[in-house]
Design a protein with these regions (language model features):
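Metalloprotease/metallohydrolase-associated module, dominated by Zn2+-dependent proteases
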Residues: 5-50, 56-58, 63, 67-86, ...
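Short alpha-helix carrying the canonical HExxH Zn2+-binding catalytic motif
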Residues: 97-113
Length: 154
């Protein structure tokens, strides 16, 4: 086990602060979903899709705290290849991918998961799943991938 994962309970307040700050930034600076994307978000299980904002960015936001940054890197959460990341109702998507339907639906599934579990519940479950199963096999990631494919291919 890596040290940052073992320190997650102590780091959680800082992680929550970071997630809340990034969500606020996305809500302040992002754009609302189009009517078609609102329909997709509803199909993905989002109860309040009108609250979602999407921010196109050159790169996905990184945590400022070194141990949180290390944990995110070790779990594969934020890599140079990361296309998008959801912070509550805020979705950050790399510039050029913000109109990619499958990516947005995938992230909307994560919004629905945040709605269901709350920020702390989402983060704890998500990180534990990735630690135990790896990023690609984490149940929350599989759910998002499968739902995105199903919705896009309807």
């Amino acid at each position: 086990m890596n040290l940052p994962f073992l320190e997650l309970p102590q780091l959680l307040p800082r992680v929550l602060d970071w997630v809340e700050a990034e969500q606020k930034r996305a809500l302040d600076q992002g754009t609302a979903l189009s009517p078609a994307a609102l329909d997709d978000a509803r199909a993905a299980g989002v109860r309040m899709p009108e609250s979602i904002r999407v921010c196109a960015v050159p790169e996905i936001p990184q945590p400022g705290h070194p141990k949180i940054k290390q944990l995110a890197a070790e779990l594969g959460l934020i890599t140079p290849q990361t296309i998008a990341m959801t912070f509550g109702f805020g979705i950050f998507v790399r510039t050029g991918r913000a109109s990619d339907r499958e990516t947005l639906v995938h992230e909307c599934v994560h919004v629905a998961q945040y709605e269901e579990l709350g920020v702390e519940g989402f983060l704890m479950q998500y990180v534990v799943q990735i630690f135990k199963n790896g990023y690609d096999n984490a149940p929350m990631e599989r759910e998002a991938r499968e739902a995105a494919l199903r919705i896009v291919n309807q």
